[in-house]
A protein has these predicted regions:
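Short, charged alpha-helical motifs in flexible N/C-terminal segments and linkers
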Residues: 1-15, 110-175
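Amphipathic alpha-helical
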Residues: 168-206
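Short conserved micro-motifs at the rims of enzyme active sites and ligand-binding pockets
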Residues: 26-28, 54-58, 167-168, 213-217
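Amphipathic alpha-helical interaction motifs in eukaryotic regulatory proteins
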Residues: 1, 66-69, 73, 93, ...
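Short, conserved micro-motifs composed of acidic
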Residues: 2-39
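Short, conserved catalytic/metal-binding micro-motifs enriched in Asp/Glu and His
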Residues: 41-51, 65, 92, 96-104, ...
């Protein structure tokens, strides 16, 4: 290649993004080596699946939080709460926020496992059992946002970044401002994108528009 880049065939995979099952995929070769077709692949820290549901990634996050929950339970008597909180923000919070704007809008069926394990970890930090402390009080006591609040926070950060720190082309592509009938000089509503499939309600674009409108209300 002219730019002196070479393809690492051993790390190269093929994936077809489609909502339907496709069989008998064509054989693709590069320099005589057959490239493998895959249904999921990890790229830049996120597991991408052929249907773009990001459920495999959610499952990986759930599994990691489950392992960390066991760690917190084991060490809660050994280290002070401040240390537990430092570990929480380093390992748990860091895992949660990584690419959350991409996969965080998944359905509650899949997200519930993350929320349950997050609650368990915070109970270990506070050294309380289930029922000893209301969930809202648990988060308030540690000054930690709940899962969906974390997701909304990062969506709002993305909206602010696109609206105020990027060229107008970002606004034109991602967000369509609607005139305010009550205050004509304001454009504080964003039109929700048209969707054809339920899975599109999980998209970053749809949820960015939704959360900014809720925030304005």
């Amino acid at each position: 290649m002219n730019n002196k880049l070479t393809v690492n065939v051993d790390k190269t995979k093929l994936m077809l993004f489609t909502p339907r099952s496709v069989h008998n995929m064509p054989i693709v070769q590069y320099n005589g080596v057959v490239i493998e077709w895959v249904k999921t692949i990890k790229y830049l820290g996120i597991t991408i699946d052929e249907n773009l549901t990001f459920v495999p990634h959610v499952n990986e996050v759930t599994k990691k939080l489950s392992q960390l929950s066991g760690v917190f339970y084991s060490i809660k008597y050994l280290v002070p709460r401040t240390t537990l909180l430092n570990i929480f923000y380093s390992l748990v919070y860091g895992t949660l926020i990584q690419n959350i704007i991409i996969w965080g809008g998944n359905s509650e069926v899949h997200i519930r496992g993350i929320r349950v394990r997050l609650n368990n970890i915070l109970r270990s930090i506070m050294n309380v059992k289930v029922g000893d402390l209301d969930t809202n009080d648990l988060y308030n006591a540690l000054d930690i946002l709940k899962y969906y609040d974390i997701y909304k926070l990062f969506l709002l950060k993305l909206v602010h970044f696109c609206l105020y720190q990027r060229p107008d082309v970002f606004q034109e592509h991602f967000f369509h401002l609607m005139p305010n009938d009550r205050y004509p000089t304001r454009n504080n509503k964003i039109k929700l994108p048209q969707i054809r499939l339920n899975i599109e309600k999980q998209s970053t674009n749809f949820n960015c528009c939704k959360v900014i409108n809720e925030f304005e209300n």
